[in-house]
Curated annotation (Swiss-Prot):
Residues that hold NADP(+) according to the record: 40-46, 92-93, 119, 140
Classification via Pfam families: adh_short
Protein keywords: Calmodulin-binding, Chloroplast, Membrane, NADP, Oxidoreductase, Plastid, Plastid inner membrane, Protein transport, Transport
Name of encoding gene: TIC32A
Protein name as catalogued: Short-chain dehydrogenase TIC 32 A, chloroplastic
Tissue: Expressed in the dehiscence zone of developing pods.
Gene3D superfamilies per record: NAD(P)-binding Rossmann-like Domain
């Protein structure tokens, strides 16, 4: 991701750039044959992605901890597009129990699943353990989505097989994945308050999203499954994620105002990777400004990715 492109909005090889919006990158795409789950689809990038996918005809399931906010989002989209197909299901990604409950609710709908957008997240939170005893940013941003994705894979595989339509998983990562702990993932001390850094813990969780994508991409390719998984950096956007940030972030934003995007621009890369036909068979990549870019060395470390995969499997299997 080049600074020049970020500032000027100049399009990259894909034909899109930092100034492109979610509507721009999905122009003329007909998604009526697709069903998508979007986690955290009640505000910011998630809501914009839900709106645009709904506008393009996809059946959108908004998965959110706050059911009122989800229903309000649904009503807003329906007011704009009365024929949109929007459903809402409750999902708290910080809770293993809630993730498993969501799976039961979704499977009961008896619909296919073509697109999974793992968008929800928390950022820069004070140290706190989830109800399962996992540091909250790691629990919500990685473990919850890791389990959700694994439990939805059979449905995605059968949908891809029966329809012939490529399934797509989009993990919302961040350039913040480059700012993590010295060892990348602090496996032995994830729940240690004495070693906790709000910003590094966030970076660790975003690195985990990338490692998860890359490990699962390799596994799906080995199986010969018609499903891709990619990671995206949305850009610098002011959303509800910043509710835990302080004065320092306000100063940073004031000094770098020319790099920040609005929400329609911030949702562009997510929607591009989820829907654009040019990305057929593209998997295991990291996108920013709707173009493939290079992540950190940690992010492409297959040994680290496999270690995180095994760690995550053991962790979720140890919980009821």
């Amino acid at each position: 991701m080049e600074i020049y492109g970020m500032v000027t909005g100049k399009a990259g090889k894909s034909g899109y750039g930092s100034a492109s919006t979610a509507e721009d990158v999905t122009h003329s795409i007909d998604a009526k044959h697709l069903t998508a789950i979007i986690t955290g689809g009640t505000s910011g990038i998630g809501l914009e992605a839900a709106r645009v996918l709904g506008m393009r005809g996809a059946h959108v399931i908004i998965a959110s901890r706050n059911t009122k906010a989800a229903n309000d989002s649904k009503e807003m989209i329906l007011q704009m597009y009365p024929n949109a197909r929007i459903d809402c299901l409750q999902l708290d990604l910080s809770s293993i129990k809630s993730v498993r409950s969501f799976i039961h609710q979704f499977l009961a709908l008896n619909v296919p699943l073509n697109i999974l957008i793992n968008n929800a997240g928390v950022m820069f939170c004070p140290f706190q353990l989830s109800e399962d005893g996992i540091e909250s940013q790691f629990a919500t941003n990685h473990i919850g989505h890791f389990l959700l994705t694994n439990l939805l894979l059979d449905k995605m595989k059968s949908s891809a097989r029966e329809s012939g339509i490529e399934g797509r998983i989009v993990n919302l990562s961040s350039i913040a994945h480059t700012y993590t702990y010295t060892e990348g993932i602090m496996f032995d001390y994830i729940n240690d308050p004495d070693r906790y850094s709000e910003k590094k813990a966030y970076g660790q969780s975003k690195l985990a999203n990338l490692l998860h994508s890359n490990a699962l991409s390799r596994k799906l390719q080995e199986e010969g499954v018609n499903i891709t998984i990619n990671s995206v950096h949305p850009g610098l956007i002011t959303t509800n994620l910043f509710r835990h940030s302080g004065l320092g972030m306000a100063v940073l934003k004031a000094m770098s105002f020319f790099l920040w995007k609005n929400i329609p621009q911030g949702a562009a890369t997510t929607c591009y990777v989820a829907l654009h036909p040019d990305l057929k068979d593209v998997t295991g990549k990291y996108f920013a400004d709707c173009n493939v870019t290079t992540p950190s060395n940690f992010a492409i470390d297959t040994t680290l990715a496999d270690k995180l995969w095994d760690f995550s499997i053991k962790l979720v299997e140890s919980l009821p």
